[in-house]
């Protein structure tokens, strides 16, 4: 298949909310477990080390109607929480044995409790990330949290998780993150060779496959990207900010790119490249994961920082990406993204950097208004910056 044909095929997989890859894996490994991982970041290495399949659960992307979830969760929260719960209530996640949620926002916190109530047969973990990164006890605190997860996975699987298992999983995911970062390097240096629409499909596919299979796929497809014969265009280099949890419709990314933008950086699917450097493979593996979360994590609105403010990290991203403008693209009702917007847009105004903002939701189907806004934004950057 050509690169374009592969992208079309992979899109059919990520659009299928029945999780066909999970069902196939479960049929082939009936005695093994599947763990659902809610965004933004969860330690995929732990269930992998237990011989389980960690799978990203990122909502339904507008592919299903919300018929049951609104009786159990507020209707005025983000789409991803409601549609994820709907996936569970309609038994589309029946082959999942556990779910991981994290302390990223009030909605995610509440969703973990709602999940425990409605799915008592599943192991439900609520992960507490450290909040004060300057505290010397932070690595110890988070390592204890990881140890608790390991102990519960051992009970679920009936398998002892050794340090060797953990180190091998860290090594495996280090390689996958390296390949995902390579996609982003291509997207930034030569955006005409790889659109964000295409890169997103390749990364999203990885949330539905065993990590080894995804890494092999990327190793085969990256050379194809370099060989594409595509002419650079006079597009504006933009960065998307605010889409770190609920996933924007793929059509929205197409509209932005068709309007004259190269999306050279974004915060989509951050877990695929969460660490700026490989997690160390020497010493205690749980300490390495904990220490890496504190010292090697990528900038995100859902993570607290120690020595650098969010404004500093944000401006560093703009500078390194040679960005002409920023698109604040946030889900409706997403408090972390919308609260950060106020602070970050003030900083952009001080730095005289162009920006625009709009909101989206999973079931969004009309994009003409956003297309016109982005086209106007592109013209203002090209002719008046």
Task: Spell out what each predicted region is.
Residues 1-33, 143, 147, 151-278, ...:
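A charged, amphipathic alpha-helical module
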Residues 2-6, 62-80, 98, 203-212, ...:
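Acidic/glycine-enriched edge-of-secondary-structure segments
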Residues 6, 342-385:
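Peripheral docking tails and interdomain loops at the edges
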Residues 29, 40-41, 46-58, 243-306, ...:
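Redox- and metal-dependent alpha/beta enzyme cores, enriched for Fe-S-associated oxidoreductases
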Residues 38-89, 97, 112:
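An N-terminal, globular interaction/scaffold subdomain
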Residues 83-155:
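Acidic/His-rich segments in extracytoplasmic proteins that coordinate ligands and/or metal ions
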Residues 88, 305-322, 339-340:
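A short, acidic, amphipathic alpha-helical segment used as a generic capping/interface helix at domain edges
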